[in-house]
Regions:
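Conserved beta-strand core positions
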Residues: 4, 33, 59-61
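Compact, glycine-rich, soluble single-domain proteins
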Residues: 9-48, 52-57, 87
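C-terminal structural segments of small proteins and small subunits
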Residues: 52-87
Length: 87
């Protein structure tokens, strides 16, 4: 299992458009991947799950992966979040 914390940099957080990019990136990996906010954990490959967390700008989340490509998965998703989804 591999875990990293990241702060969502874009002002509006993970609304529909950036959440879609996040899920698309997560689905590139074989590992099981989760996003956790304040002890609530959801499947990072589920749009409804990610949106249900209500992640706004400035929120710190955990990206968690377990599987063969767990480090690559977490690092790629953290980089995407840190980029601000180019918004």
């Amino acid at each position: 299992m591999y875990i990293k914390d990241v702060t969502v940099e874009n002002k509006v957080g993970l609304h529909a458009r950036p959440a879609t990019f996040f899920i698309q990136k997560a689905n590139e990996f074989k590992s099981s991947i989760w996003v956790e906010k304040e002890e609530r954990r959801v499947n990072a490959k589920s749009l409804l799950g990610v949106l249900s967390l209500g992640i706004v700008g400035g929120t710190t989340i955990k990206v968690i992966a377990d599987g063969a490509d767990e480090e690559a998965a977490v690092d790629a998703l953290v980089s995407l979040v840190e980029s601000g989804f180019e918004e």
